[in-house]
């Protein structure tokens, strides 16, 4: 027994030492993992989308795009006044909303023309008159300046888009044929809603509403100038009386209803506000309500922010503002470019991944083609700044796909944060 005592003593001491040890643990932040699954059934021969350009040609479009520009002050009847509706601006030194629109549109139509079936409607239909009835006449067949194209090959579509650009460039900033009248938005939306060509179930259908003012001109408006708080008069100097008793009141509700009616017909409305009136006062709330009803969601990323006065939601990858707001030619061109990227049929062999859809590491992306896991390589697919680009035989399969024989592709991307 004595021979074992040292061993027992050693064990006792060892146990005591172990019992007295202490450990320091460093806090570790839990790993948050999110997975995004993107499923695409690709048909390379999808029909090209229809887009109706509904362009506001009201009198305010001839106002300066930058009223603070000293060159926009002109002599008129013995005093200095801001050029615009009453006195034409010298557009070389004082660009107007209309001339800025004319400068922004060509690139949009040229870059999108072969991918999109465009049409053009302007409003109001003043017929050159300046009275209340003429100023508030909504769009009609007479202001449907260019219908949807009959041919769909790239060259024909590009020529069609070029003709639409020529029509817009042909509307002068001053003189006969210049922008005149009010902003009968709800009635004009109702007109394009009734066009059979925009109700094509085999295509995506869009209306791009480009307006610089608050909607008005609704003679059936339930509000009147007799109640200024409810009327929210859109006429200068609170001019909602006589012929403008109802026509001059803000026509927000009917405009939203008109957009909802379009959406019920599977026609999405994209709203662009252009100028100071849509950026302040009642403007943002009205355009936001219309844009939300229109169903078009503005996507964004660090590379493609939402623009001045707006932010990108990193969780959804969408802008917090649903409508586009542009204050000058550059901002309008950017809005049109974003729309072009969103609506035209993309490169068939590219599946875009935006914002939160992208993995935090390329190794955390898994691709399935027709249910079969497909590793990345130069002959299968690669991840680039735009998304997943397919090459080789997979791209050939995509290009040969038809509505009857599409290609099913599934992307699973993991984000660690």
Mark where each language-model region is:
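Sec-dependent bacterial lipoprotein signal peptides
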Residues: 1-18
């Amino acid at each position: 027994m004595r021979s074992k005592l040292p061993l027992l003593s050693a064990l006792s001491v060892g146990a005591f030492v172990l019992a007295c040890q202490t450990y320091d643990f460093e806090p570790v932040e839990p790993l948050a993992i999110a997975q995004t699954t993107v499923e695409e059934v690709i048909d390379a021969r999808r029909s090209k989308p229809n887009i109706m350009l509904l362009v506001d040609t009201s009198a305010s479009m001839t106002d300066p795009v930058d009223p603070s520009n000293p060159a926009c002050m002109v002599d008129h009847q013995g005093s200095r006044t801001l050029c615009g509706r009453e006195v034409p601006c010298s557009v070389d030194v004082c660009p107007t909303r209309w001339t800025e629109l004319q400068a922004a549109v060509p690139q949009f139509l040229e870059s999108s023309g072969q991918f999109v079936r465009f049409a053009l409607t302007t409003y109001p239909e003043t017929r050159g008159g300046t009275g209340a009835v003429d100023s508030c006449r909504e769009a009609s067949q007479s202001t449907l300046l260019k219908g949807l194209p009959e041919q769909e090959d790239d060259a024909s579509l590009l020529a069609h888009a070029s003709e639409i650009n020529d029509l817009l460039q042909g509307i002068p900033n001053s003189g006969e044929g210049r922008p005149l009248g009010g902003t009968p938005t709800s009635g004009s939306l109702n007109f394009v809603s009734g066009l059979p060509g925009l109700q094509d179930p085999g295509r995506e259908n869009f209306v791009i509403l480009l307006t610089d003012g608050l909607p008005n001109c609704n003679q059936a408006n339930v509000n009147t100038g007799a109640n200024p708080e409810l009327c929210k008069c859109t006429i200068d100097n609170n001019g909602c009386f006589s012929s403008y008793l109802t026509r001059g009141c803000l026509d927000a509700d009917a405009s939203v209803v008109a957009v909802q009616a379009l959406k019920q017909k599977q026609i999405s409305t994209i709203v662009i506000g252009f100028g100071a009136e849509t950026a302040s006062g009642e403007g943002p709330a009205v355009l936001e309500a219309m844009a939300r009803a229109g169903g078009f969601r503005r996507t964004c990323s660090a590379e493609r922010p939402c623009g001045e006065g707006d932010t990108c939601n990193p969780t959804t990858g969408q802008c917090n503002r649903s409508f586009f707001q542009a204050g000058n030619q550059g901002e309008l061109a950017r809005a049109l470019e974003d729309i072009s990227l969103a609506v035209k049929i993309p490169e068939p062999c590219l599946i875009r991944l935006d914002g939160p859809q992208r993995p935090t590491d390329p190794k955390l992306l898994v691709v399935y083609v027709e249910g079969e896991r497909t590793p990345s390589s130069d002959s299968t697919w690669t991840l680039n700044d735009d998304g997943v680009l397919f090459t080789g035989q997979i791209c050939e399969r995509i290009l040969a796909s038809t509505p009857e024989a599409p290609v099913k592709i599934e992307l699973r991307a993991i984000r660690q944060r």
